[in-house]
Structures are given as C-alpha cells and as structure tokens.
Amino acid sequence: VPYTIQLRRKQEQVKDLLGAMIAADKGELRQIVGMKGEPISYRHKAATPYAHAGRGRITCGFYARGSPRIVSCNDCLAEDPRARHILNAVGRAAELQHIPAYDEDKGTGVLRHAVVRCGYATDDVLLTVVTNVAQLRQPGRFVSAIRDAAPEVTSIVQNVNTRRTNAILGFTNNTLWGPGTMRDKLLGCTFEIGPTTFYQTNPAQTE
C-alpha cells in the first residue's frame, strides 16, 4: 500500500474514533505528519522468535497470522539493514553449539528470542539473546560464533525468561560480552540503552 494512502487511512481512523469529541470541544484534527521519503529501514529495534526446524536446524522470522508457526525471513525492508542478518546469525550460532530452540507447547529448549537494537546516530549494536535457562553451556563459544558471523555487534546480553508467557523478555540480564548497553544520540541528547530500556524504534520520525 503506498505510504500516502497509509497516512490517509490513519487520518480517517483517528477521525472515526475521535471526530465527535474533537467537534464537541471545537477542536481541530490536524493532518498526520508522515516520514520524509519512503518508510524503509526505519526500525532500529527488531526481534525474532526461534523454533525447531528439524534435523538440528533452527528457524526464525515472524509468526504467521493467527498461528504459532514461524515464517522464516532473511530480510525485512522496515528494519535497519543490519538487524535481520544479526538475528539469523544467532540461530546459526545456536545450531553450531547444539543449543536447542524453545518449544512453546512443551516449555522445553533453550533459545527463545533475540532482540537487536542498532544505533541511529552511532555504530553501537546491542544484541539480547533470550533463553529458557539461566546458565548456558559454554557461553564463550556461543558468543564467539555470533561475533564471527556478525562482527558489527558491540555487546551481547543474555536475558533469562523461564515463564510460560508470550512476553519476550524476562527479568534477569547477564552480560555475555561487551558493556551490556549501547549508546545512541537523538535530538541532541545521548542515551545509554539497555536490554529493557524504552527507546524510540523510529528515530528519524521522532526527529
């Protein structure tokens, strides 16, 4: 759908929801301000679930609509160009280290999700690997395999989530390599960002 039509539809949705209230208050619904140019490569945070793919393989990508099935994805136009490569590299590193993917139905396995944050104004890249266990076997080898495949990553953190939940992140973080945080600049301010920090996923639109 062309971006101009997306914006028009959003404008119509807001008007349908709030139009009567705005009119009652004698207010004005201003035109939605969209991004400059086409909305591609704008998401500086990306996440993926992992699942068994048979014969020791691991798949990652996006959930199919209305289904727990994961559709593999090698690239996503909405995300920072670095993001999907890094998320896929985690899956390949887990395969090399024989780290099993999480099974939602059984609640077994290790690798649940990964979340990557890519700097907008810096080259920092924070990777958070979400596991179903507190202690990884030979974490150093796992980290080395990720770094070999994705040298742009500047820090790797393990997040522990052992709950049977749809929430991606748990409450415990263990830094596996690097500072455990990243830094980015937005609107003239420098932010230190951790695995659970709220930060704008679309910095260009924010500015």
Where do the model's predicted regions map?
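Accessory RNA-recognition modules of RNA-modification enzymes
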Residues: 1-207
